[in-house]
Structures are given as C-alpha cells and as structure tokens.
Amino acid sequence: AQFYNVSKARIYGAEVSTNGVCTFNPNTTLSYNLGYVFIEPEDAGYKKKNEEEAAYDDPMHMKEKSNTSKYLKYRQKHTVKAVLDFQWKRLTLGTNIVWKSKTLAVDYLMVDERAKEQPEIMDYVRDILFGNVNGQTLHSYWAKNNTPYCVVDLRAGVKITKELSFQFMVNNLFNKEYSTRPMLVSAPRT
C-alpha cells in the first residue's frame, strides 16, 4: 500500500466556548466549561485526485481514501463538549459530555464507500486482511457504526480532610460503542 500526502489541505472553522462558576451559597457551587467546534477539513486537490483514481486500470492500485468527497480523512465536522462540576460542602459530582459527528472519510485500504455494481479485487483482499464472518465485514461494521455519537463520563468525590479525598469515576457511563476509525472501537465502560 502506498499512502499519499495531501498537497493542498484547507481546514477552517470556528470554536465557541464559555466557562464560569455559579455560586449559589458559600457551600454550593457549579462550575462549567461548554464548547462547540466546527471544522471544514478540505482537500483542495480532491477533484484532480478523483480523476486520477478513476483512470487507474490496475485493480490492485490503491486509492487514497474511502470515498470521493472533498474531506480529509479521520475528521469530524462537529464537536460539542460540556464539563460540569457541582460542589456541595465536601461532596462533588461532575460529568464530561462529548458529542461528535460522524467521521467523513478513512483510508481506502480499510473501507471503500464508493457505489459499485460488483465487488472489486480489493474487496476480496479486505475480506482476507480483516475477515468476513457470516457476511459481517469491516465495511459493513463501519457503515453501521460510523454515526454521530455521544459519550458521557461521570465522577463523584468526597473530601475527607484537607489532604485526603476519594473520587469515583465511570468513563463511558452508557457503554456507548463508537469508532473514530476502522478497527479502533472505543473502550467500553470503565
């Protein structure tokens, strides 16, 4: 497999965030950090690259990415994050919430999202490399699971003394299965 550098990448976007602390009384506070990120991760040379790849006559010649879109590989357009911490006397309760939109493109070696009338040689190569169990392939897994996702972490703590405190944390509270790239399934609840 040969991998290519993108000759003309353009990534632009916007980020908005706010943070603060709400003090309800001397013993009770809520701190927050909220944010949103939008990016438009473009390969400015994608049209030329797609034309070159369409002209390939060697069925084993590698394409660069999983689809013909203008987007760079392994990027999501939207991310929303929230960190909230509530403190009452010696007790704390907090959460991290992250929502991300689907991944826009991945490596062609892993997945081919292009529409086609019949399988290509690379589809069989992928089955050999990554497996095909009862019709479940890396491609079918990716097609089903490359969706927007939200992950929630939860933490609780108690301050025993000035120097001693205990914290309990649950990552991925709802045990959401998500994948940011093929063959990299997220960690389950911990």
Where are these regions (language model features)?
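C-terminal beta-signal and adjacent terminal beta-strands/loops
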Residues: W99-V125, L129-Q136, T147-Y149, G157-T190
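Transmembrane beta-barrel architecture of outer membranes
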Residues: K77-K81, V151, T190
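Gram-negative outer-membrane beta-barrel transporters
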Residues: Q2-L109
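Intrinsically disordered, low-complexity coil segments
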Residues: K47-S66, R114-W142
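Extracellular loop and loop/strand-boundary signature of outer-membrane beta-barrel proteins
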Residues: Q2-V6, K65-Y71, H139-W142, D153, ...
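One-face residue pattern on beta-strands with alternating periodicity enriched for small/polar residues
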Residues: N33, K81-D85, T92, D153-K159, ...
